[in-house]
Amino acid sequence: MFDGMLHSAPCALTKIRVTKRSMTRFTVQSLLTLLLLSCTTDSYDKGEGKYSLMQADFCELTVDGQKQALTFTTDDGDTYQFTTPFTAKWIETADTTYRSVIYYNKVSTTQAEAVSVGTVVTVNPIEHWRFKEQPQDPIGFESAWMAKSGKYLNVGLLMKTGRISDEELPHNIGLAQDTVYTYPDGRCAASYRFLHSQNGIPQYYTNRRYVSILLPTVKPDTIHLSIQTYDGIVHKTL
């Protein structure tokens, strides 16, 4: 029997743009370093100093009242203060935290120099019946892994995109929670289903995008994730 909650406002999907650059880079030298990193699997001499290697991490970026990024905390739980605070066009809200991906130089155990920072789209698992629509257009799946903190489940996607005009249309995504089951011993398992609308976007080329799933405060012991891909439904258990 339903409990009456069906009368609450239906949920919409989250928009994600895949052709527009969302990374903020800080210097030409940093950009060249970033390009070198992306083209080389083992770019650096392992004999270099402990803090000389550029690193890349998913993080929570803390922004102050002036929309300046001051600190970030990685998925491994390490917190750093930026040697030089910065802002960016995509930082639109003051006094908040952004889910981000960051390339940085570790200056000390508590400080870091930002090289390139961008936003990561975050979705929450929502009961399936709360969505206005539940599209499952195929999407490329690359990887899924749990953040060490246990707060996020990160998913790597390959999204097909293109343009038929100057207008840039977004893909629409969401995460439907189909079931939550509690075993007699108290363990909990949740089944999540990835929602995706191609939104009529031409499929001319492929872009890699990452999405973070913000897990409930009381986290399931086991997560079953299903994604409709071009090769059929992929099931991942984490």
Description of each model-found segment:
Residues 95, 194-222:
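Short, solvent-exposed, Trp/other aromatic-anchored flexible loops in extracytoplasmic proteins
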Residues 35-38:
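C-terminal motif of bacterial Sec signal peptides marking the signal peptidase cleavage site
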Residues 43-67:
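Structural detector for short beta-strands of small beta-barrel domains
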Residues 108-111, 220, 228-236:
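Short acidic/polar inter-strand loop motif in beta-rich domains
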Residues 77-92:
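Beta-strand/loop nucleic-acid-binding surfaces
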Residues 106-130:
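OB-fold/S1-family single-stranded nucleic acid-binding modules
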Residues 142-195:
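Short helix-loop boundary/capping segments
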Residues 91-113:
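Flexible glycine-rich surface loops and low-complexity tracts that mediate binding to linear polymers
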